[in-house]
Amino acid sequence: MDKYRLTPHKITICVLVEYYLNGTIKYHQKQSLSHLLIRHIKENNYQDTVKEVSLYDFIEKELKYVLPIQFINNEFLRMIQFDSVDDIYQFMSSLKELFNGSNDHESINSKQMQLLDSKSILGIFIKKVILNFNQILFDGLIKLYDQLDQYLNDFYNEINKIQQQQQQQQQKEHCENDNSIDMSMDQEQQQQQQEDYNEISNYENKIKFLSPLDEERFIYEETIRINSLIGIETPLEIENQVNRLKASLPNVKRVHLISLLFNIGYQDYDQSLEDLHRYFDYVNGQMTSSQWSSSASSFLFTPNDNYQSGNSNSSNYYYNNYNFIGGSGDTTNLMLPYAVLNLVRLHYHFGHYEESYLALREAIRIAQERADHSCLALADHWLARLLKKSVYNSMESSNLLQYLLASHSDSEILKKSIERSRDLEMPDLLALNHTAFSKYKLENGEFSTNINSNNYNSNNNNNNNNSNTNNNTNNNNNTNNANNNNNNNNNNTNNTNNNNNNNNNNNNNNNNNNNNNNSSNSNNNGGVNMFGKSFHLWNDIFQPIEISRLLDKSSSTAMIAHHLYSSSWELLGNNDLAQFFTELAMKSYHSNDLSLQHDPLRAVSSQNTIIYNIGTNNNNNNNNNNNQIKQQQQQNQQPPDLLSFCKLALLYSKKSKYNEAIQILIKCFSIYKTQHLCGNLLTFTVLSILFDHLMINIDNNNNNNNNNNNNNNNNNNNNNNDNELLISIVIESLINITNRFQSEDSVDGSGWSQIVICYQKIIKYYCNVRGMYEKSMNLIVKGIQISRDFGLDSQITHFYSLLSKIYEKSSPYRFSGLSDTLSALSLSNSYHLANSIADSNIALIKIHLSTDRLDKAITLIKETLPMVLSDKLLNSQLYLLWAKSLISTSTKQSIDYLNRSEQLFLQLFSNQSNNNNNNNNNNNNNNELLKEIYYLKSIIYNDLGDIENRNLYAKKFKSILVPSSSIQQQQQQQQQQQQQQQQQQQQQQQSNQSPVINSVQPTPKICLVPPILMKIR
């Protein structure tokens, strides 16, 4: 290698020199990197004939032992990848700034760049490289660019070659295993026992040679690994692994934490409590103050909370690096308040809320005595949880919290916790509080702008076109700069999520240009921004989620945010966006996210061979290599969390895509084989989907009864009886598995929400199938009371809507549902739910038409149509109602609206028929809708004197009212009766020999006018 010639390896050394000076690098890594750079520079200067080192050998043999693999994957390979010749020129220009610095003094002060000494070894090398580069002509630049490209291509090809070799080796191992299947069971058991014994002995021998620090790191990684197996492996197998670690490393304190998480995961309260006490007995008082400051770890575990239905893994915890604030240097009982806080969390998880509150009071008392503000901030968070309606109303002795509820609320305590965690610079807790605040707004529907002005933007008001804030305040100010109130002509675009699902959360003054990207595939399901107060509500919901993601960029926080977005869009009625964010949550889940070794660069073999995740390339060969690498990584990926699986299955069921839902459930059962021992989430999901499927079958059988003969009708009736029996069993099972003491951090989610969902399913079954209106009303009243008492105000809208439909179906009490319709409408307006508002408005429009208030009906129709532009069924119903209101005034417009209604309905029906999974939830209602359309058209054309169209739509109406099969049966019966009469008459003629005049029986007439529509005619 010529020392006077620029090579790709020299360019790589220059990249590392620049990173050595100004990169984020630890001291010991910086020292090792300097030795590596100096050695390679000397080799380039004194060994001209040595062949240049390849990139793969350089990384595999030297660089990966100096710098972390994560840096090599995410930054280093991008640094040495140049997309054009201009990129090489810009890089060389940046090398000159290493000696003199940049002209921008502000950037120098902010970044604190370190200059390179021109007389040092590194400085002399960089100067030679710059000198050689300045002497290169344009043809030489092209050649250097091609060499760099080939330099990277060789690296990719080497990775691909190693992958193929490993795959071949794995295939050979599989073949050898297949050949040894003939071994007897006794020999296999003996061999397995011997292997287990050898593994344990080797395991213990290897662990004995670990240093204390390595032991802690090893147990930390084992904690994460074993915790990710809960619900997947059998409890006995996990327990054996935990016992093996205890026997090997009995003095390592975190071993007992593994046992604690294991017992929490499998819902063993007594053993969890014992392990918690044992864990803190080992931890307490065994570390000096210097050890605490050096380790920077409190060993405190708090729930990685999921605010929709609980976390996918009930014992998924993260460790926070909090600085302990104490008045004295005494380390005795240093961990006592945190031990009590963990006791609070343990009682809360198992639904023992009284014990949890008493333990929280003790933790607050100890923290106040020691002036431990970090512990008090955590206590505020847990106090806000205990003050929730769903918690304190579940207590058997709720008088414990009466004095607190008289002066405080959960939202006030939560705001206080947000302020305290911001002041103490606790970003993890601050992110957790923001997501809790977002969930509170989502459930209760309350909003105010004070939280934005007092908490979010207290330090972020930029005037006179200033876009930068001071970096010397705290971590939260750094992250909240994305939410600044920019004055005096600032252009503010705030993209808060993927795929156009954006919710802008900035309040801009004085001619700001807000680009609000609230569209979602042009399917917004009804103008949420039409309402004046909706901006503040959704600003309070979506803005805290984005702040939490800025504060904590871990995959667990991203998964929580995606589930909250999914719940919000599902509440709005947009199931497509809810499914989209659920799939994002599945992609962002990593059970080993807390691992110190967490990296997409995973070892693919026991020989420490690494697969690198490469960025974009310029060559097709590179793209093929990347695709193969991604496929290998996808095969090695961990399965998504159970919560995302179940939620996606429920969304498919809600859209009547049962085949997809069943496939997801089958995959869940194949992965989470022991999940039934951890909780009831998977069982609840299966029963809910089974209930929906049985309801569809009953509707299909009822519709088929009108199109089949008597034998088929009997079969359908028998099938309905079987389905109704199964539904009753499913309802009993759903009620049995619900538990009001299920905490929101449990794998099953909040218990009261599941109970309310069960009530809604039972009400729909009693009302739509069985016609049991009294039972339905009793359950509705009970469901409304539960929703009010336990903080589920968003569910009250559905109950009032169901109650108004019950009154609508019972004709004597039809106008009694007006108050319930208005209640559902007001609640839907307060929550800005477009579909619920449309349903309530349709019920109110029908009442207006029944009382001849046509002007109010037309006005309400015009207000409702923009809300449901994407829902063809609701659009069809609204146009039908509009046509009814115009029959007496304008027949042409009425026919026009009837044509629109028919066209929308037929489009919806054709889309459903093309889909293999037809949505038949409203088949009976749809038939009634089409029947009314044909009936009204036949009446209007009759009044206009258009006999042809009148007969056409009368036949269509008759075909729906009396199916063709039943008409054919009637005709056959009439023919048989006529033949019998003719035979009888012939017999009489032969006996009496007297003429008899045959009497002609009139055919039965079919009424074309239902009694409901007589008044409109």
Curated annotation (Swiss-Prot):
InterPro entries, per database record? Apc5, Apc5_dom
Tell me the segments the record calls region Disordered: 451-527, 617-636
**Gene Ontology CC terms, in alphabetical order:** anaphase-promoting complex
Keyword Acetylation in record = no
User: Where in or outside the cell is it found?
Assistant: Nucleus
User: Repeat TPR: residue ranges?
Assistant: 30-63, 182-214, 252-286, 337-370, 508-541, 642-675, 756-790, 838-871, 876-908, 931-964
Cite the entry's keywords alphabetically. Cell cycle, Cell division, Mitosis, Nucleus, Repeat, TPR repeat, Ubl conjugation pathway
Which pathway features in its UniProt record? Protein modification; protein ubiquitination
Q: Report biased composition (Low complexity) as residue ranges.
A: 451-525
Is Cell cycle a UniProt keyword of this protein?
yes
Pfam families linked to this entry: ANAPC5 (PF12862)
SUBUNIT field? The APC/C is composed of at least 13 subunits that stay tightly associated throughout the cell cycle: anapc1, anapc2, anapc3, anapc4, anapc5, anapc6, anapc7, anapc8, anapc10, anapc11, cdc20, cdc26 and cdh1.
The similarity annotation says: Belongs to the APC5 family.
| Functional description taken from the UniProt entry | Component of the anaphase promoting complex/cyclosome (APC/C), a cell cycle-regulated E3 ubiquitin-protein ligase complex that controls progression through mitosis and the G1 phase of the cell cycle.
Protein name according to UniProt: Anaphase-promoting complex subunit 5
Instruction: Say which species the protein is native to.
Output: Dictyostelium discoideum
Lineage of producing organism: Eukaryota, Amoebozoa, Evosea, Eumycetozoa, Dictyostelia
